[in-house]
Structure formats: structure tokens, C-alpha cells
Amino acid sequence: MYISFILFSIIFIFLGVIENFIINKRVLYKPNFLLYSEKKNKKKSTPEQVTTRVNKDLKEKKRKRPRSKILECLLKEKVEKVEKVEKNSDENQCSNVDKEIREGKRVPRLRVRNTNNHIYASIIDDYKKYVLCSTCSRDATLSKILGTYRRKATNRVINNGRTIKSAWEIGKIIGKKALSKGIFKVRFDRARHPYAGKVEALAEGARAVGLLL
């Protein structure tokens, strides 16, 4: 009886080894019922655990984008902030800004448009579909601030709106215009433009003056 028991066990082990070779699995000298029991005991990861794992991987991949050296130098400069306009002042009552915007109940939108040669900024009241104030690097009065250059295609002298410094100045100008009208907070709408280069410089220039983005 003892010899027959050993023979049967050896035959079962041999059959298990052959089965593993056929299925292209690694050879395990264990009976089949033990293999199935181990598979059942394995815990499946929940969807929450999967999402947390994916988020951790994304955070590790993300790296902090370094700012440009020109913008860092501009941020170190001392900028004169615009004095806050009182809510019930005569200038505020005559302006085209609603009382809800001045009190902060409704927040207008700072729309930015960036091209190769120029940058545009305008503050829009989406409720009334009205432009409250705007500025751009094409304004002839800003030639001394932004600087000029001669365009080869047209042989015309135009404002230099291609640099980070020009975007910084445009940001300061739009910020001063907004604060003088009683607008202290805006939503920054950069559209399809990435938050880098001139777009970032414009936003930081508006913040430097005292405008909340």
C-alpha cells in the first residue's frame, strides 16, 4: 500500500509538470489544487488604488519648469502699485464698470492673445459682453516703453512686441487700467497659449501692479 501511494503521487507530480510545460508556464512541483487556491487568495486592486498609483506616477514624471532669466530679473524690480480706488468715488461712478464687479460679486475675464510680433490684452465683462479696457503692443504711444524695430517685409518701423519685457510692460499697463476703474480681480484666459514666455510675463506684470488673477 505504501509503495502504491508513492507511485500514484509521483505519477500526479509528473502529470502536473507535463501540463505546465504544455501551457508554457514555469515548472512548479505542486499539485493543481494548490495552484488554484493560490490564485483565489490573490487580492485584486480596487479602482481607487489604481487611480492613486497612476497619480503618483504622473507626479513623479512632472518636473517644475524653470522660469526664464529675463522674467526673474523683471520680478526683482520694484514696481509702483496702483492705489485702490474707493467704491463710492466720483471716478468709479462715472466709469463703465458695474457695481457688482467693483464689489467683487462678478469677476471679469482677462483675455490674452499672443502672436509672433505682438501681444494683446483685454478685460471683458462676459455678462454684458462688453470690453472694459484693453491694450496691446501695437499702440503707437507705447513706442518709448517697448522699443521699436524696422520690419524687413514692409520696411516700416513698428513696436517691438516680441520680447518678454514688452509682455511684462503690457501686463503692467492692463493692470493699472483695470485698477483705476475699480477692477481688482480677474479670471486669466490664456486660451490655447501655454503658460510660458510672453503669456507668463504678462500675467506676472499684472500681478506686480496689484491685480489679482
From Swiss-Prot:
Q: Which InterPro entries match?
A: Ribosomal_uL18_bac/euk
Q: Does the keyword Disulfide bond apply?
A: no
GO MF, one term, reads: 5S rRNA binding
Q: Where found in the cell?
A: Plastid, Apicoplast
**Which SUPFAM superfamilies does UniProt cross-reference here?**
Translational machinery components
For this record, the Gene Ontology CC terms, alphabetical, are:
apicoplast; ribonucleoprotein complex; ribosome
Set out the biological process GO terms recorded for this chain's protein: ribosome biogenesis; translation
Print the keywords alphabetically.
Answer: Apicoplast, Plastid, Ribonucleoprotein, Ribosomal protein, Transit peptide
Q: Is Transit peptide there in the keyword field?
A: yes
The source's superkingdom equals Eukaryota
Pfam family of the protein (one): Ribosomal_L18p
Family note: Belongs to the universal ribosomal protein uL18 family.
Q: What is this protein called?
A: Large ribosomal subunit protein uL18c
